[in-house]
Amino acid sequence: MPFVVIITGIPGVGKSTITKLALQRTRAKFKLINFGDLMFEEALKLKLVKHRDEMRKLPLEVQRELQMNAAKKIAEMAKNYPILLDTHATIKTPHGYLLGLPYEVIKILNPNFIVIIEATPSEILGRRLRDLKRDRDVETEEQIQRHQDLNRAAAITYAMHSNALIKIIENHEDKGLEEAVNELVKILDLAVKEYA
């Protein structure tokens, strides 16, 4: 039976670090897939874009088609090995927040778990300010908290349409990284019996 874990968190929460460390420790051999990368590869193949930043400017129906194609590929891959899908639950745009995974995509992916990585707004803000290599929007602590709240709401919506379990993992500055990695490993290890 396919085993798909969606992992999400706003920029600066430490999702990439936790994911990388957990994949090194889990007993299951997950395939890590970035949903946006898969969409971008398809768009390049179809000569729709040359750069990733152009993806946001594609017509909505084209973006939806790219999402559907990516979801179908992932569902097919999940028949052979467990998938850890790195994606955004919500995407902040100049006009508001966009759901990262529309209903049709969630139905195809049918995840087992939706994992949200969180930290306090002050921790996230501090990490963003220390990571000057990344081009990130400047947000207040209130805006960061709002984005995390919207991610929780999106995860509930996704779970309603897939029967996935939601797991919130906190990544705090004071020894939180190790605990966060261990919590994710426990979830990933559940896939071992599915692919034995």
Curated annotation (Swiss-Prot):
Annotated compartments: Cytoplasm
Residues reported in the UniProt entry to bind ATP: G9, I10, P11, G12, V13, G14, K15, S16, T17
E.C. number: 2.7.4.3
Gene3D superfamilies, sorted: P-loop containing nucleotide triphosphate hydrolases
InterPro entries tied to this protein: Adenylate_kinase_AdkA, P-loop_NTPase
Reaction catalysed by this enzyme: AMP + ATP = 2 ADP
Molecular function per GO: adenylate kinase activity; ATP binding
Entry keyword annotation includes Metal-binding: no
Keywords: ATP-binding, Cytoplasm, Kinase, Nucleotide-binding, Transferase
GO CC term, one of those recorded: cytoplasm
UniProt record similarity statement: Belongs to the archaeal adenylate kinase family.
Protein name per Swiss-Prot or TrEMBL: Adenylate kinase
Organism: Pyrococcus horikoshii (strain ATCC 700860 / DSM 12428 / JCM 9974 / NBRC 100139 / OT-3)
